[in-house]
């Protein structure tokens, strides 16, 4: 008998970082960061790698799809962002990070844009987006853009994680937003959501399911949790359900994608220093998917992806051996 052992995704010699998923016609495009741990987390610069899957059991690996820049360019590292599709093709809005810029006291996190016809090969825009850190916001924490089309207002909405001021101890984390008619010229609209509960928010996302809008985010804290809020309106007010987390501690940086039939949450489970459970978490680890479902009261739940669970069971069951049962 055969048994499937694929309950997660982690290429050999690689630790998976933030994932920027996109779904289309039963297939998921899993754009993700690959950390080599050489010599440690964030040691070697990375771009976005790509793997596609229809069942979360078998993956097709394309290697680095959105390639990192040089050590002199703003996207020495390609941090998180989002991917979506228009009639003209695929768009990626992402955060470029350069550690040399940080050392020199320059803005180290820059919002950038790339396009693709097939979602595999990307062409970067020549200039940075005119979405710089605004006055009064921390210039070192301005990242993880997410873009969606607002049908009611007939414009694009971009949200990203930010922090008011530069004191990392204060709970001034918030989401800010910009709007655009053409994906080129963006207008700053101020704070989108500023609940005063964390020092920073990462990997924000908005989607609609039924009559509800959902706002997903990761708390920038030792909790390492993915939370959500809900509202009947795109701009809130956002309410917190009693159980607002998709999983427990150490399931982080999750974004969802819809392939036309189901919505799946893409997050990662971190490793620990020296692989010792007593030690602190490291950035990056193993990708684990959860299928998202909506309950009758409008709250959300998650469950294992069906095909992955089927794979974990014996494909050719045999009677139990009384000696081993």
Residue ranges and their predicted role:
Residues 50, 56, 60-86:
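Blade-loop segments of beta-propeller domains
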Residues 1-7, 314-320:
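Conserved small/polar residues in nucleotide/adenosyl-binding loops
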Residues 17-41, 62-63, 79-104, 111-113, ...:
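Hydrophobic core segments of beta-strands in well-ordered, beta-rich domains
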Residues 49-53, 110-118, 174-181, 227-233, ...:
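Beta-propeller blade signature
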Residues 202, 252-254:
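Repeated scaffold domains used in trafficking and secretory/extracellular systems
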Residues 6-8, 56-70, 119-135, 183-197, ...:
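Blade-edge beta-strand/turn elements of extracellular beta-propeller
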Residues 233, 240, 247-249, 258-262, ...:
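Beta-rich accessory regions
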């Amino acid at each position: 008998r055969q048994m499937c052992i694929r309950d997660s995704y982690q290429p050999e010699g690689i630790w998976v970082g933030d994932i920027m998923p996109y779904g289309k016609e039963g297939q998921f495009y899993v754009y993700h960061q690959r950390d080599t741990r050489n010599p440690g987390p964030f040691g070697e610069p990375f771009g976005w790698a790509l793997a596609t899957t229809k069942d979360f059991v078998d993956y097709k690996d394309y290697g680095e799809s959105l390639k990192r820049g040089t050590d002199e360019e703003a996207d020495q590292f390609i941090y998180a962002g989002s991917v979506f599709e228009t009639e003209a093709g695929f768009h990626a809005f992402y955060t470029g990070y350069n550690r040399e810029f940080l050392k020199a006291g320059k803005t180290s996190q820059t919002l950038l844009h790339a396009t693709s016809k097939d979602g595999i090969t990307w062409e970067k825009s020549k200039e940075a987006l005119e979405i710089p850190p605004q006055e009064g916001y921390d210039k070192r924490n301005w990242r993880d853009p997410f873009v969606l089309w607002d049908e009611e207002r007939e414009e694009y909405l971009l949200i990203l994680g930010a922090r008011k001021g530069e004191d990392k101890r204060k709970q001034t984390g918030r989401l800010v937003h910009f709007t655009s008619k053409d994906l080129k010229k963006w207008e700053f609209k101020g704070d989108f959501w500023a609940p005063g509960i964390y020092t920073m928010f990462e990997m924000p996302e908005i989607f609609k399911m039924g009559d509800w809008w959902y706002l997903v985010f990761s708390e920038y804290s030792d909790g390492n949790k993915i939370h959500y809020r809900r509202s009947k309106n795109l701009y809130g007010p956002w309410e917190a359900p009693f159980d607002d987390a998709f999983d427990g501690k150490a399931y982080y940086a999750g974004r969802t994608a819809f392939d036309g039939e189901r919505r799946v949450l893409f997050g990662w489970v971190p490793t620990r220093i020296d692989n010792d459970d007593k030690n602190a978490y490291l950035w990056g680890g193993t990708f684990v998917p959860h299928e998202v479902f909506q309950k009758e009261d409008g709250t959300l739940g998650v469950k294992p992806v069906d095909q992955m669970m089927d794979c974990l069971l014996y494909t050719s069951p045999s009677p139990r051996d009384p000696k081993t049962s």
